[in-house]
Amino acid sequence: MEGPAFSKPLKDKINPWGPLIVLGILIRAGVSVQRDSPHQVFNVTWRVTNLMTGQTANATSLLGTMTDAFPKLYFDLCDLIGNDWDETRLGCRTPGEGKRARTFDLYVCPGHTVPTGCGGPREGYCGKWGCETTGQAYWKPSSSWDLISLKRGNTPKDRGPCYDSSVSSGVQGATPGGRCNPLVLKFTDAGKKASWDAPKVWGLRLYRSTGTDPVTRFSLTRQVLNIGPRVPIGPNPVISDQLPPSRPAQIMLPRPPQPPPPGTASIVPETAPPSQQPGTRDRLLNLVNKAYQALNLTSPDKTQECWLCLVSRPPYYEGVAVLGTNSNHTTLISTIMGLLIILLLLLILLLWTLHS
């Protein structure tokens, strides 16, 4: 009986580049899982830029993960409106003009998502009322979907003109650079979940009861840098030599003293206590105790609800855990999917090896 068509051995039908392809996919999957780790620390820089002048109003850098590096950003209104803003001499060229700018309400409109009728850059994306999502005004503009909130900082209302402390150091209330219109930018919950791969733009306007409200625009940019490879840690040089646990010192019974020769005074010899080197267990307990003392002195509120954990094998890493709620549902699913993909690819590689 003739065999069926295409009855060549299985190994003749397999792509000879199969192992390399599978290996490349495995490496790529491993890199993807490592890159998507929510615990990886980066050097994150947030930058607020005045788009009218190109000047940087704020640049804040910090170390953190992609899910928690969202600090408050502090800058000044004069960093956004500059010296000469419009034809009504509203700006920050003189100390008096800076003080005057403090008397106006301000409102902010997003340029990253522009609703219908809100205009473009010329209107500061505030082409009609209702486009504003945040600010400091009597009608309290707010939004449930915008990425930031921008409010005025704490400035005493009775503070006088905005004098520069480097020029007028003797004037009460003078500040560095004459800045007396502090602003505070905070990230909303939506902003902490948004993608910041590209700059995002907002328009800012000061509210005036008559005339046109002047416009300025600013951008917010995030720059993420890898802090480099991790440096291996350990072993702890203090407890590198392993010793058994300390044992109670053996009590040596003294021998009966020899009677002194006739005519000499009796001298009782002093015996030094036997020296005992602490064992590994003693030093580990001392390490935990010292860590607790340091934690208790620096953050006494944390010692009431935290655990001190010590790995029982070298290099004896020590960790601090605080009780709280946490949810890693999304992270757990992505991790499981990544492991399943790797196991599937390993199975394919194993089958190829068996048939070759």
Swiss-Prot record:
A single GO BP? symbiont entry into host cell
For bias type Pro residues, the affected ranges are 254-263
Which ranges belong to the motif CXXC? 306-309
Could you list which ranges are Virion surface topological domains?
A: 33-331
Question: For the region Disordered, what residue ranges are annotated?
Answer: 247-279
Glycosylation site positions = N43, N58, N296, N328
Q: Which residues form the signal peptide?
A: 1-32
Per the entry, what this protein does is: This envelope-like membrane glycoprotein is responsible for ligand-independent activation of the erythropoietin receptor EPOR leading to the abnormally rapid proliferation of erythroid precursor cells. In the first stage of Friend disease, constitutive activation of the EPOR by gp42 causes uncontrolled, polyclonal proliferation of infected erythroblasts, leading to polycythemia (massive increase in the number of mature red cells).
Q: What is this protein called?
A: Glycoprotein 42
| Originating organism | Friend spleen focus-forming virus (strain BB6) (FSFFV)
